[in-house]
Amino acid sequence: MTEPSRHIPVLGQEAVGLLAPRDGGVYVDATFGAGGYSGLILAAADTRVIGIDRDRTAIAGGFDLVERSGGRLTLVEDRFSNLAEVCAAQGAGLVDGVVMDVGVSSMQLDQSERGFSFRLAGPLDMRMGQSGPSAADVIAVASEAELANIIYIFGEERHSRAVARAIVAARAIEPITTTRALADIVGKVVHAKPGEIHPATRTFQGLRIFVNGELDELHLALSAAERVLKPGGRLVVVSFHSLEDRIVKNFFNARGKTGGGSRHLPELDQEAPSFAILTKRPITAGPDELAGNPRARSAKLRAGERTAALAHPGEDLPAWPTLDAVMGRR
């Protein structure tokens, strides 16, 4: 059996405990990252794991685990919203479990050249897949109103209009191309009190989510997981901020109860629940994990078990700002 990855994933034991890997099962680590969840799954049972990540650096970093797995781990460079297509291409059919660790990885945050962190000097990049427009590109061309919407909707920054105004004023003088430059601009209009988060936290979050289309990706990935899980298969999702957790919570709530049907057309069948919810309340990190990994403080884990009911129809994506809409006009 494979030794676990040296990387310790947030809520890793809880996540794998809920997945309950069994010999001969097929599991999808939809956000491979540093391979922590994959390593734990491979160590727990004689399973096959398909690891997906849009970041080619993460895929390259996982080759050692691939070798140690004895052929039980396959890595695929792709978005996790495409997990159904990935499973089909790998001949996996329906799978026994899917785990998702949503958002930016610790590895990405710690690499200054990736431009995710306001604490490290680097280019203002923020692309998980290292292709397409960067955060600097968005900052350069988005209107003041668009920037304010992006920072407010995806960063939940209540000073978004002031931040957007400051960005537009600063870029008129010189391009904003580094993390430090943007953090300094934000710090002049957002003033944190002692003990509060860094003034640039929400602005960086908003830009990162926007650049990578993270919330749309999550919506699509959850629906894809619903389609590829066999009855009894389990979906485990770890999220790190309220926007993500709300999407996951609403997904499980919508699929964990019988559809309302129509009082006007009572003969129509109600939608049967496609998931049995395993976590009535989200699981959070305990004091021991928090002592060793402060980044776990905002993590919430939710899980569900697939029933034999048909997958629910996919909902329309929310009408929030998109990268194509902002960049496509330029």
UniProtKB/Swiss-Prot annotation:
Q: Tell me what reaction this enzyme catalyses.
A: cytidine(1402) in 16S rRNA + S-adenosyl-L-methionine = N(4)-methylcytidine(1402) in 16S rRNA + S-adenosyl-L-homocysteine + H(+)
Gene Ontology terms for molecular function: rRNA (cytosine-N4-)-methyltransferase activity
Broadest EC class assigned to this enzyme: transferase
* Disulphide-bridged cysteine pairs: none
Q: Name one GO biological process term.
A: rRNA base methylation
Stored InterPro entries: RsmH, SAM-dep_MeTrfase_MraW_recog, SAM-dependent_MTases_sf
Pfam families with a match to the protein in the record = Methyltransf_5 (PF01795)
Would you name any one GO CC term? cytoplasm
Subcellular location per UniProt equals: Cytoplasm
Cite the entry's keywords alphabetically.
Answer: Cytoplasm, Methyltransferase, rRNA processing, S-adenosyl-L-methionine, Transferase
Domain of life of the source = Bacteria
Q: What is its EC number?
A: 2.1.1.199
The residues that the entry says bind S-adenosyl-L-methionine are G35, G36, Y37, D53, F80, D101, Q108
NCBIfam families hit by this protein = 16S rRNA (cytosine(1402)-N(4))-methyltransferase RsmH (TIGR00006)
Function, as annotated: Specifically methylates the N4 position of cytidine in position 1402 (C1402) of 16S rRNA.
Q: What family does the Swiss-Prot or TrEMBL record give for this protein?
A: Belongs to the methyltransferase superfamily. RsmH family.
HAMAP family attached to this UniProt entry: 16SrRNA_methyltr_H
Q: What is this protein called?
A: Ribosomal RNA small subunit methyltransferase H
